[in-house]
Structure formats: structure tokens, C-alpha cells
């Protein structure tokens, strides 16, 4: 089992807009891409000790291959408008993935 977290920062005061854009993209990718294989999802934002401008979009996959296939699907043209909508809220250079293997 793998916990795959997409981390990104948004400009001050834009968290709500960014979360709405992420929600729209999330609904589509969970319905029509390799993200259908996720075992669980959640979205977290900084609260105490973490900046409220930091967002973590988390997915749990059974295999690393399932995660890689889901990410590959995001390159399809049908997702372009959704990713472009979110892009305006992402601080350049802040986005990255962290992948953890569940051991217990």
C-alpha cells in the first residue's frame, strides 16, 4: 500500500478558490482515470505549525504501478482545462509529490 501526497502552496487569501478548483479536477479524475483505483483520499491544509497556504492532496494506492498509471492519465487532453484552472493558484516551484510505503 502506498500513500501518495501531492503538496502545493497557494498565494495568501486564495486557498478557497484553489480548493474549489482541486475539487472539480478531483471529481473528474476519480471518475475517468487511473485514480479510480484509489483506496482512499483526503485533502489537508496547514493549521498549526503549517502554513494555511500549504495544501496536501492525498491518495492511497494498492501498488506503485497504479499510482504511476493514474499520473500518466493526467497528461490526457480532457484534463487540460482542469489543470489550467488550478495552475493560476499554484505558487511556481512549490508543487511536488511525496510517496510513502505503508509498513504497519
Task: List each model region and its residues.
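Absolute protein N-terminus
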Residues: 1-2, 104
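Active-site-flanking beta-strand signature of metal-NTP-handling nucleotidyl enzymes
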Residues: 2-9
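Short beta-strand micro-motifs enriched in acidic
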Residues: 44-48
Amino acid at each position: 500500500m502506498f500513500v501518495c501526497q501531492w503538496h502545493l502552496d497557494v498565494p495568501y487569501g486564495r486557498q478557497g478558490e484553489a480548493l474549489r478548483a482541486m475539487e472539480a479536477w478531483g471529481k473528474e479524475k476519480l471518475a475517468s482515470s487511473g485514480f479510480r483505483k484509489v483506496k482512499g483520499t483526503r485533502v489537508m491544509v496547514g493549521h498549526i505549525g503549517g502554513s494555511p497556504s500549504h495544501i496536501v492532496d492525498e491518495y492511497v494506492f494498492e501498488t506503485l504501478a497504479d499510482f504511476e498509471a493514474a499520473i500518466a492519465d493526467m497528461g490526457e487532453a480532457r484534463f487540460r482545462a482542469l489543470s489550467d484552472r488550478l495552475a493560476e493558484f499554484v505558487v511556481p516551484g512549490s508543487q511536488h509529490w511525496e510517496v510513502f510505503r505503508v509498513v504497519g
